[in-house]
């Protein structure tokens, strides 16, 4: 029993280990593609964000360069186009011959970091009032013209292209038979026809007149002909008369033994036996199957 319990315990442990291994392998097979897809999605999103940041920085840097290139002296006054305009004058600078003149411009410095985007500007002023329309809003309908008289017909135009072919018309009624023509020339003789069927048997001929038969003279002896083919085998001959009996043959081998005969009648009953000895009861039984008796014997 203890050995069987150990086998069951080891079997349970082995099955559990195999089951956990299969579950772990399936989990890895399912998790790895999901992690790969997530990492690929994050990488693609980061690349899009970096490209967007680069484009924004490039746009900001372009606007900064445009602001630097604007001339500060040419400033347009505000409220231009209203009641009063303010003309901005350029700053007057006095000349000085004895002053030190600035040197040549140095090399361009490294571009600075892009600044933060500015705050949205204040809303603009209302626009100027629009001009009145040059044309009326409702279209003016001119009076209808009087109908002119019909002019003379023009010259005929060139013939048009030929139309498509029409469908087949209905079949006409059969015409009258023509007059028979003149007989034609004799044609060449045709090929020989197939042989005709055999004719009916003719009438039997008349019997020849009876005349005495006169034998003719014998002709010369001819050369001997070739040997003819062998003839058909002849009919088998009749059976002959039976012969005289032959001498006595040797003795044959002994035959197989015959089958057993029928069982005999039962014999008479024997004399009754004597009285048997007294039985001996076993004293105890051993574990290995032996039996011990009171007289010390073992069976």
UniProtKB/Swiss-Prot annotation:
Keywords, comma-separated and alphabetical: Collagen, Cuticle, Disulfide bond, Repeat, Signal
Matching Pfam families: Col_cuticle_N, Collagen
Purpose: Nematode cuticles are composed largely of collagen-like proteins. The cuticle functions both as an exoskeleton and as a barrier to protect the worm from its environment.
Composition skew (Low complexity), residue ranges: 173-197, 250-268
Cellular component terms per the entry's GO annotation: collagen trimer
Family of the protein in this entry: Belongs to the cuticular collagen family.
Record-given protein name: Putative cuticle collagen 155
Region listing for Triple-helical region, in residue ranges: 103-132, 151-177, 181-202, 216-278
Signal sequence bounds: 1-27
GO molecular function: structural constituent of cuticle
Compositionally biased region (Gly residues): 163-172
Subunit text: Collagen polypeptide chains are complexed within the cuticle by disulfide bonds and other types of covalent cross-links.
Ranges of biased composition (kind: Pro residues): 129-161, 215-233
PANTHER family given in the database record: COLLAGEN, NEMATODE CUTICLE COLLAGEN N-TERMINAL DOMAIN-CONTAINING PROTEIN-RELATED
UniProt-annotated stretches for the region Disordered: 107-278
Organism: Caenorhabditis elegans
